[in-house]
From Swiss-Prot:
Region (Disordered): 238-261
Cellular component GO terms held in the UniProt record: cytoplasm
Protein's recorded name: 14-3-3-like protein D
Family as reported in the entry's similarity comment: Belongs to the 14-3-3 family.
SUPFAM superfamilies: 14-3-3 protein
Pfam families with a match to the protein in the record: 14-3-3 (PF00244)
Residue ranges crossing the lipid bilayer per the database entry: none
BP GO annotations: protein localization; signal transduction
Originating species: Glycine max
Length: 261
């Protein structure tokens, strides 16, 4: 089978797997495409992203539920149950780590080296920022700091590329601003910086809304709505003296904002 036939086959299987909600297989199929070291089409890029988003999303939801139950058991003083939950939670954390590390490897070894400047580059650096952010959600100590630093670096690279190559109304640029602001709010506990970034992205897009083509109008306005929802939610968290709020009792906020695909 030729490389182009292989590619066609992998993409078709990935679409089938998505329909069947078999996201691990969807990811495997799209990793096969990435391994060909070719520039992915928009459709292929989205298939890869959706597959990974579902694979990681299920574990992130599990982790949040387990953390919440663990907290309740600790509050009640049920040490044995808390210990059981902790062990189970750590199993989920290992899965999360493996998925995130897998994403980074595919991005660094195949996707970024094969990407053209512009949209693709922004997309992959944003994706890298997202998956380091997911690591920072559950890591602690130096590992958390390292994941947060890497996430920041990736988001900054994505932002520099987006500002150079994409208009403020572009859905990928808006999605990047949305997720980067969630990073500031949830990981760095900086509601003020989160709001500044979200508001700037929203205002810049509003001023150029009339330039939006019909194709991306729906996507862009949906993300703008999420930016506005998060701004409303976060503004109440900014202390009156203007300083960023620190973590309450050292615990990170869970589910502090909406993020994009």
């Amino acid at each position: 089978m030729t490389a182009s036939k292989d590619r066609e086959n992998f993409v078709y299987i990935a679409k089938l797997a998505e329909q069947a909600e078999r996201y691990e297989e969807m990811v495997e199929s799209m990793k096969n495409v990435a391994n060909l070291d070719v520039e992915l089409t928009v459709e292929e890029r989205n298939l890869l992203s959706v597959g990974y988003k579902n694979v990681i999303g299920a574990r992130r939801a599990s982790w949040r539920i387990l953390s919440s139950i663990e907290q309740k058991e600790e509050t009640k003083g049920n040490e044995l149950n808390a210990k059981r939950i902790k062990e189970y939670r750590q199993k989920v954390e290992l899965e999360l780590s493996n998925i995130c590390n897998d994403v980074m490897r595919v991005i660094d070894e195949h996707l970024i080296p094969s990407a053209a400047a512009g949209e693709s580059t922004v997309f992959y650096y944003k994706m890298k920022g997202d998956y380091y952010r997911y690591l920072a959600e559950f890591k602690s100590g130096n590992e958390k700091k390292e994941a947060a630093d890497q996430s920041m670096k990736a988001y900054e690279s994505a932002t520099a590329a987006a500002e150079a190559d994409l208009p403020p109304t572009h859905p990928i640029r808006l999605g990047l601003a949305l997720n980067f602001s969630v990073f500031y709010y949830e990981i760095l506990n900086s509601p003020e910086r989160a709001c500044h970034l979200a508001k700037q992205a929203f205002d810049e897009a509003i001023s150029e809304l009339d330039t939006l083509n019909e194709e991306s109008y729906k996507d862009s306005t949906l993300i703008m709505q999420l930016l506005r929802d998060n701004l409303t939610l976060w503004t109440s968290d900014i202390p009156e003296d203007g300083e960023d709020a620190q973590k309450v009792n050292g615990t990170a906020k869970l589910g502090g904002g909406e993020d994009a695909e």
